[in-house]
Every structure is written in structure tokens, then in C-alpha cells.
């Protein structure tokens, strides 16, 4: 479970970061 959660977070975090970067 934690493995899947970590993988999901690793994929989501950069995505969110990119979104904020593009907005800025």
C-alpha cells in the first residue's frame, strides 16, 4: 500500500509543481 502511495505522490507532486511553475 505504501509503495503505491509513494509512487502516486512522486507522480502527483512534480505534476502540481509544474502547474504552479506555469502559472507563475
From Swiss-Prot:
Gene Ontology CC, one term: other organism cell membrane
Subcellular location: Secreted; Target cell membrane
Keywords, ordered alphabetically: Antibiotic, Antimicrobial, Cytolysis, Fungicide, Hemolysis, Ion transport, Membrane, Secreted, Target cell membrane, Target membrane, Transmembrane, Transport
Protein name, UniProt field: Pandinin-2
Keyword Ion transport assigned: yes
Job of this protein: Disrupts cell membranes through formation of pores. Has strong antimicrobial activity against Gram-positive bacteria B.subtilis, S.epidermidis, E.faecalis and S.aureus. Is less active against Gram-negative bacteria P.aeruginosa and E.coli. Also increases efficacy of antibiotics (ampicillin, chloramphenicol, streptomycin, kanamycin, novobiocin) when tested against E.coli, probably by facilitating their incorporation into the bacteria. Possesses antifungal activity against C.albicans and hemolytic activity against human, sheep and pig erythrocytes.
GO terms of biological process kind: defense response to bacterium; defense response to fungus; killing of cells of another organism; monoatomic ion transport
Coiled coil: none
Superkingdom as given in the UniProt entry: Eukaryota
KW Metal-binding (keyword) present: no
InterPro entries: Antimicrobial_4
A family per Pfam: Antimicrobial_4
Protein family membership: Belongs to the non-disulfide-bridged peptide (NDBP) superfamily. Medium-length antimicrobial peptide (group 3) family.
Chief place of localization: secreted
Entry comment describing in which tissues the protein is expressed: Expressed by the venom gland.
Subunit-level organization: Homooligomer.
Amino acid at each position: 500500500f505504501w509503495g503505491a502511495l509513494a509512487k502516486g505522490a512522486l507522480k502527483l507532486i512534480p505534476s502540481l509543481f509544474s502547474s504552479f511553475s506555469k502559472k507563475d
